[in-house]
Amino acid sequence: TTVGGADTGYEWDHPALKQKYRGYKATLDTFDHNYNWHDAIHVPDTHHIDVGNPCGMDSQEPCDDQGHGTHTMGTMIGSEGDNQIGVAPDAQWCACRNMERGYGTPFTYIECFEWFLAPTDLNNENPDPLRAPHVINNSWGCPPTEGCNPDNFELMNIVVNNLRAAGIVVVVSAGNDGSGCGSVYTPAAIYDGSFSVGATRPNDTIVGFSSRGPVWVDGSNRLKPNVCAPGTGVRSS
């Protein structure tokens, strides 16, 4: 199973992630980022006064400019020998950076979704749908401050539906805007085609910050999230 991650980037050579990175060839101790990594960050985000990003723009290798992506990937597949911190330690991963230090746009989010449909080489050429991941994790939301609003919700919805039609499961965080009703309000958690996940405490109660349904923002009254899972005090990379 291959897990695709879309986030702030990933520290691919982290001890808990390196052996599971699809681009790493353990027998030769070499790596190939073609078809395994894409950077959708081409310009600095306007939320930041400074323009210095530790990963730069259009990074040719997996890089995490904030740390959030590395943590989420460890939660999914992290494993270092007997030190298995992920829930699917036998899976491998590929990735796309869709946020610049925690901020994205509809364009960066959609670009990563489209890349996962048919991953390309580092020149963004020769797309190959046979290298698409089986599931994509998205621990982010696109609020109005990033440019998502009811007028353009359908753009990302089309891409999510295309991924589902290709047999790819789109997993999305329900959001951290709880605890009121209707607080699942950002793409891609709001869509029928996404599998959105809320957060629980160790005692199986819902965490206060975890967003609740139903989805009111688009008038659908859709029941979300689909499931809940541990979301606090999670040991990861």
Q: Residue spans of the language-model regions?
A:
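Subtilisin-like serine protease catalytic core
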Residues: 1-108, 126-135, 164-167, 189-194, ...
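Generic beta-strand/beta-sheet core signal
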Residues: 6, 96-98, 138-141, 171-174, ...
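Short acidic, glycine-rich surface-loop motifs adjacent to enzyme active sites
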Residues: 116-151, 173-174
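Active-site-adjacent substrate-recognition loops and nearby beta-strands
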Residues: 144-153, 173-192, 198-224, 235-237
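Catalytic-core regions built around general acid/base machinery
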Residues: 152-170
